[in-house]
Amino acid sequence: MFRGGEKMRQIPKEVIEEVERLREEIEYHNYRYYVLNDPVITDEEYDRLMRRLIELERMYPELVTPDSPTQRVGGKVLEGFKTVKHSVPMLSLDNTYNEEEIIEFDKRVKKTLQESEVEYVAELKIDGVSIALRYENGRFVLGATRGDGVEGEDVSENVKTIRSVPLRLRKPLTIEVRGEIYMPVDEFKRLNEEREEEGLPPFANPRNAAAGTLRQLNTALVASRRLDSFIYYVVHPENYGLKTQWEALQFLKEIGFKVNPHSRLCKNIQEVIEYWREWKERKRELDYWVDGVVVKVNRFDFQKVLGETSKAPRWAIAFKFPAEQARTRILDVTIQVGRTGVLTPVAELEPVQLAGTIVKRASLHNFEYIREKDIRIGDYVFVEKAGGIIPQIVKSIPELRTGSEKEIKPPQSCPVCGGKVGKLSPDEVAIRCLNPHCPAKLKRALRTFVSREALDIEGLGEKIIDRLVDSGLVKDIADIFYLTPFDLAQLGPGIGQRTIAKILQEIEEAKKRPLHKLITGLGIPMVGQKTAKILAEHFKSLEAIAEASYETLKDIPGIGPEIARSIVEYFRNPKTREIIEKLKKAGVKLEEKTVKYDVLKGLTFAVTGTLKNFTREEIIEFLERLGARVVNSVSKNTDYLIVGENPGSKYEKAKALKVKTMSEEEFLRFVENRAKLKGYNFDEIMRGWKEWS
C-alpha cells in the first residue's frame, strides 16, 4: 500500500504501476540470487532495475514504502530499540556432546511416544543470532531478537538490510517464522582485519559479530556488513496445513525464505548420528560457522505430546561438535605495525596442532585485551580458532605460573621507526605509530598492492619489499612502476640479473591487470575484492570512481552509505590523487576494457573439488567471461558440474539429479569446441584470459 494521501492523485497511473512492477521484479531476482543461488539476469541488468526504481522514488517520494527494495541499503540512524513481546516464547535448546547422550535422548522420546522408531530432522546449528520475523499479507512488518525468550528487541530496520530476508513473500500470508542471522566467514575475517586496522577491538567469533552488527543504531553500517540468514521454523504450522518439520522447511523455501540446503530427514537416531559425524568433518567446507546439529522430532503431533520445559522443548536437542581448543605456551610477544599504524601484539607460541593445522602465532589484538585477560609471556594458554579460521588466545592458566612469567607492556615508541606512539582519541583502544612516514605502514600497503588478489607481482616478496622501503627506493605504492634494473641491483645479495629481469617483467605485466585488481590493491578501507569488482563494473575507470560523488556511490547495489563514505574520503586525500597521477604516467591501465566472449552464454555451471589450472575464484571469473552463469549449489537447472579432485556433496547431488559432469580437461575441450562453433580462436581466448587474470 503506497502512502501519500491527496498527492497520490497527482502521480501518473503508469508511474505507480511501473514502481510496483519494478519492486516485484527486483524482489523476485533477490529471491533467485540470495535464496535459490540461481540468478536469471546479469548484475548489470539487476543494477539497471534498481537504478530506475531509485530514480522514480526520488521523483515521487510519496511512493516510498517500508518494503521497497531501496530500503535495504540503510541510511537511518535509530534512537534505540523498543521491546516487543513474542507471540510464542523463543525457547533455548538443551545441549548434548556425545553419541551416548543423543541415544539417551532418543530413548526418552520413544518411551514417551510409545514408538519403536521416531523420524527426526537434522539441521546444521548455525553460530548466529536467533530472529523472529513477522509478515502481514505477505509484507515484512517486524524483526525481533530472542532477548530473554519472552521479550526481544525490535531490530526491523536492520533486518531490512539483509538481502536474503524477503520484504515481500511469494504468497500474501500473515505468518511468523524464526531462524538465524549470521555473518559469513569471509565477511567476519574482512571485518576483523578492518577493525584492527582502525584500532577497534576485533569480534571474538562470528556470532558476536552478527549480534553486535544487528544492534547497531546506524542502519547503513549494518548494510555494509553483509549479514545473511537461514529460516527453519514456522509459528503455528497447523494454520498452513503443515504436519511435519520437513514439510515446514519446504514450505518456507516456497514462500521465499532462505533455507539451509544441508538439512536431512532421518528415519532414526542412527541416521542422525551419521549426519553429525559427516558434518563434524565437513564443517570447514561451509562459508558460515556451525557448532553442531539441531535434532528435531519430525511430526508436529509428536512434538505436542512431548511438550517443553520452561526453558527448552523436549522434542529437540542441540548435538554439539567437540570444542576445538588446544593448550600451549607463550614464548614471546612481537609487535606488528599495520597499514594505518596500529600496533598489534602477536603471541609467539610453542607449535600446537589445532583444527587441522599447526599454530605457531596468535593475535593478542591490543594491549587492553591483554590486560583484561591477564596474559603474560611464559603463560600456558588456551588457543582456539575464531570462526574456525583465526587463531586467538581465549584465556591464560594462572594456576600453572612459576613466577618467571613477564608482563606484556605497551611500547613507548614504534618498534619499526622509533617514532611517537599514542591514540587518535581518548576512547580508542588501539595504540598507533603517529609517524606519517613510518616504513612499516608502507610495507603493509605494498604487500596488499602486490598480492595475488591485487596486482599479483610474485617476485616482490616480503624481503624485497622490506629492502626497497628501507633503502628509500620506494616511498609509495606507485613507485613500484618506476623501478630500474640499477635500483634493484642495489638491493644486495640474492638479487641477480635473472631475478631482476623476472621482477621487471612481472611489474610490466601488472600494468595490464583488470581494473578490479588495481582497486583491490589500493587498500581502500572497507573495499575488498567483491566491492572492487562492483566498482570496476559500474564505473569502468579509476578516474571515474575518484570523481564519483557520495550520492552516486551509495545508491549502487552492494555499496551503501558506509562504503561510499570511505571511498569518497580515500580519493579526497591529495596523496591519493598524486598516486593516481603517477600510476597513469607509468602506463598502468586505469580503465576496464575486458573482452567478453559468448562461448558459454545461456549455460549454468557449478564447480566442486580442487582444479589444477584454476583457483576457485579464477574458474568463476573464467566462466563468467565466457558468458556462463555460475551457481554455488547444484539444482535441476544446472547444466554442467565441473569436477576437480576431492569433490564435495555437489557431485553426489549432480548424479542424483542426472546433471552432466565433466573433468577439468573435458571442460577445456568443451570450451574449445564451443569456441570453434562460434567462430572464436580458443588460443586467443586463453591468451586473453591469462593477461586479464
Swiss-Prot record:
Residues annotated as the enzyme's active site: 125 (n6-amp-lysine intermediate)
Molecular function per GO: DNA binding; DNA ligase (NAD+) activity; metal ion binding
GO terms for biological process, alphabetical: DNA repair; DNA replication
Catalytic activity, as annotated: NAD(+) + (deoxyribonucleotide)n-3'-hydroxyl + 5'-phospho-(deoxyribonucleotide)m = (deoxyribonucleotide)n+m + AMP + beta-nicotinamide D-nucleotide
Binding site for NAD(+): 43-47, 92-93, 123, 146, 180, 296, 320
Pfam families in UniProt: BRCT (PF00533), DNA_ligase_aden (PF01653), DNA_ligase_OB (PF03120), DNA_ligase_ZBD (PF03119), HHH_2 (PF12826), HHH_5 (PF14520), Nlig-Ia (PF22745)
Stretches assigned to the BRCT domain: 595-684
EC code(s) of this entry: 6.5.1.2
Residue numbers binding Zn(2+): 414, 417, 433, 438
PROSITE patterns named in the record: BRCT, DNA_LIGASE_N1, DNA_LIGASE_N2
Cofactor or coenzyme needed: Mg(2+); Mn(2+)
Keywords annotated in UniProt: DNA damage, DNA repair, DNA replication, Ligase, Magnesium, Manganese, Metal-binding, NAD, Zinc
EC supergroup of this enzyme: ligase
GO cellular component: cytosol
InterPro entries reported in the protein's UniProt record: BRCT_dom, BRCT_dom_sf, DisA/LigA_HHH, DNA_ligase, DNA_ligase_AS, DNA_ligase_CS, DNAligase_adenylation, DNAligase_N
General function of this protein: DNA ligase that catalyzes the formation of phosphodiester linkages between 5'-phosphoryl and 3'-hydroxyl groups in double-stranded DNA using NAD as a coenzyme and as the energy source for the reaction. It is essential for DNA replication and repair of damaged DNA.
Family indicated by similarity: Belongs to the NAD-dependent DNA ligase family. LigA subfamily.
Name of the featured protein: DNA ligase
Taxonomic placement: Bacteria, Thermotogati, Thermotogota, Thermotogae, Thermotogales
Gene from which the chain derives: ligA
